């Protein structure tokens, strides 16, 4: 099981997340987000960590803008937000020859309607995030475990090779109380649950989280295939 720290906006938080052993570090380029960063800032912060750890979160559906973001940041792992599976497939067709990694965020709910009839062509992973009040993620709300498990089973049945990440308001307390449940996922995505304010990570919470995670049996070998 891998750990992703997302919504990073400060140099000191990036450096700490990397040093604590987080596998993936996410930088958000979406203007509606309180953690939005301009591409120049993303490039500066992501330069502090190994290339394979950086993830660029974007909600644009325009391939040209995605290519611009890749060119300006140097990040080759892209997380698509507020984009349909069909659109993600078209983006993949445009980027495939370049060898970039695409992951797609699914807002929960709705549930099975997200994936029925879709093949997720070219998508290497899916991120389950909570939807609320018209927002398709970034709500800071926990996904009901029954909903997430329903989607996980459907995804596993369709394509066992797809990496499935659980996001949505995750905290250390929740992980401790639901250890068996969260261990079913390939990756856990932490953002608001380890913050004192939007984009401001709590260093004590981060350290406590990573210390706990490193002791889990499912954590063994997590970095072997990022």
Curated annotation (Swiss-Prot):
GO molecular function per UniProt: phosphoribosylanthranilate isomerase activity
Catalytic activities: N-(5-phospho-beta-D-ribosyl)anthranilate = 1-(2-carboxyphenylamino)-1-deoxy-D-ribulose 5-phosphate
GO BP annotation list: L-tryptophan biosynthetic process
Domain of life: Archaea
Known pathway: Amino-acid biosynthesis; L-tryptophan biosynthesis; L-tryptophan from chorismate: step 3/5
InterPro entries listed in its UniProt record: Aldolase_TIM, PRAI_dom, RibuloseP-bd_barrel, TrpF_fam
Pfam families: PRAI (PF00697)
Enzyme Commission code: 5.3.1.24
Gene3D superfamilies: Aldolase class I (3.20.20.70)
Keywords from the named record: Amino-acid biosynthesis, Aromatic amino acid biosynthesis, Isomerase, Tryptophan biosynthesis
CDD domains assigned: PRAI (cd00405)
Family the UniProt entry places it in: Belongs to the TrpF family.
Name of this protein: N-(5'-phosphoribosyl)anthranilate isomerase
Record lineage: Archaea, Methanobacteriati, Methanobacteriota, Methanomada group, Methanobacteria
UniProt gene name: trpF
């Amino acid at each position: 099981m891998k750990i992703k720290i997302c919504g990073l906006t400060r140099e000191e938080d990036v450096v700490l997340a990397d040093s604590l052993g987080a596998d993936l570090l996410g930088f958000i380029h979406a203007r509606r987000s309180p953690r939005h960063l301009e591409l120049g800032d993303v490039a500066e912060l992501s330069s502090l960590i190994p290339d394979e750890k950086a993830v660029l979160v974007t909600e644009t559906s325009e391939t040209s803008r995605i290519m611009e973001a890749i060119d300006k940041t140097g990040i080759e792992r892209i997380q698509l937000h507020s984009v349909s599976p069909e659109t993600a497939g078209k983006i993949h067709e445009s980027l495939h020859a370049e060898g970039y990694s695409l992951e797609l965020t699914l807002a929960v709910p709705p549930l099975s309607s997200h994936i029925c009839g879709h093949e997720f062509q070219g998508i290497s992973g899916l991120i389950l995030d909570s939807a609320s009040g018209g927002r398709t993620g970034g709500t800071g709300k926990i996904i009901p475990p029954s909903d997430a498990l329903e989607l996980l089973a459907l995804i596993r049945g369709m394509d066992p090779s797809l990496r499935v990440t659980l996001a949505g308001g995750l905290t250390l307390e929740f992980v401790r109380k639901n250890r068996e449940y969260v261990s079913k996922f390939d990756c856990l995505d932490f953002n608001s649950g380890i913050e004192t304010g939007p984009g401001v990570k709590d260093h004590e919470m981060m350290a406590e989280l990573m210390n706990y995670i490193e002791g889990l049996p499912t954590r063994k070998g997590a970095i072997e295939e990022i």
